[in-house]
Amino acid sequence: MFMINIACLIIPILLAVAFLTLVERKTLGYMQVRKGPNIVGPHGLLQPIADAVKLFTKEPLRPLTSSKLLFTVAPTLALTLALTMWLPLPMPHSLINLNLGVLFILAISSLAVYSILWSGWASNSKYALIGALRAVAQTVSYEVTLAIILLSVLLMSGSFTLTNLITTQEHMWLIIPTWPLAMMWFISTLAETNRAPFDLTEGESELVSGFNVEYAAGPFALFFLAEYANIMMMNALTTLLFLGALHTPLVPGIYTANFVLKTLILTIMFLWIRASYPRFRYDQLMHLLWKNFLPLTLAMLMWHVSSPMSLASIPPQT
């Protein structure tokens, strides 16, 4: 029974990821005044299936000089961790209700760095290694602000459980009192998922394809799926934190529809940003974090910790 529950979680995520690639190609196409995929199936709707068949039936080539074990394990680990992060999300029939769900998500997203590092190192290629080092530095740096913003928001809900956030936002979305944090969070999620304008790990102009340059066929598809699963996960988390989904116990379907709609809108914003902005320079990316976001988020955290004590003379609720 538990395996059926896991399958019911994983299969829809993988399907959503497959069609997200189609939505991205269509969106970018229309924004660049062209059609996008329109040959395979009606209006190109079967394009993701054709891509999957092509990638998984090709021979996965491996460079002779690469490290065999790590080269194979890295893409599998990337997808496994990307899917594991979905477990504590409060769905109508969630698999697991963790008391420390937020910490679990933070820990797993930190582990995801290893798959990128291993893939770049095991490829034994200069391009892949530079891409991997960039990705690791970028991801680890932006994790700092993500953690601080999470702490600031959780001080308002008073618990590390994700279901508590829904109860907290019954009357007002948390994006209203914490809009500066929400803006910094959204930009940090862009950097955390290595998306434009922070996609320096796969800078085509200088690194060909970044850390996955030596991967082909199935393993490449696994990295691709992991990246898009992470994007949707981060947007689902943003919805939970700042745009609390409407919840009525009598009609659980409303919660699901509300949650999915907001996540979709945020995901389309990711695609819109990709179509609109050029890539940042690496030093600008790091300056944005260490010189702008970090001092601001620390100041906001101190504000969230001190305001209950100063205004109501009560200690912060945990």
UniProtKB/Swiss-Prot annotation:
Record organism: Myrmecophaga tridactyla
Protein location: Mitochondrion inner membrane
Assigned GO CC terms: mitochondrial inner membrane
The reaction(s) this protein catalyses: a ubiquinone + NADH + 5 H(+)(in) = a ubiquinol + NAD(+) + 4 H(+)(out)
InterPro entries assigned: NADH_UbQ_OxRdtase_su1/FPO, NADH_UbQ_OxRdtase_su1_CS
Function summary: Core subunit of the mitochondrial membrane respiratory chain NADH dehydrogenase (Complex I) which catalyzes electron transfer from NADH through the respiratory chain, using ubiquinone as an electron acceptor. Essential for the catalytic activity and assembly of complex I.
Homology family: Belongs to the complex I subunit 1 family.
TM region(s), chain numbering: 2-22, 69-89, 100-120, 146-166, 171-191, 231-251, 253-273, 285-305
Subunit structure: Core subunit of respiratory chain NADH dehydrogenase (Complex I) which is composed of 45 different subunits.
Protein name: NADH-ubiquinone oxidoreductase chain 1
EC number: 7.1.1.2
Membrane topology: Multi-pass membrane protein
Biological processes per GO annotation: mitochondrial electron transport, NADH to ubiquinone; mitochondrial respiratory chain complex I assembly
Primary gene name: MT-ND1
GO molecular function: NADH dehydrogenase (ubiquinone) activity
Alphabetized UniProt keyword annotations: Electron transport, Membrane, Mitochondrion, Mitochondrion inner membrane, NAD, Respiratory chain, Translocase, Transmembrane, Transmembrane helix, Transport, Ubiquinone
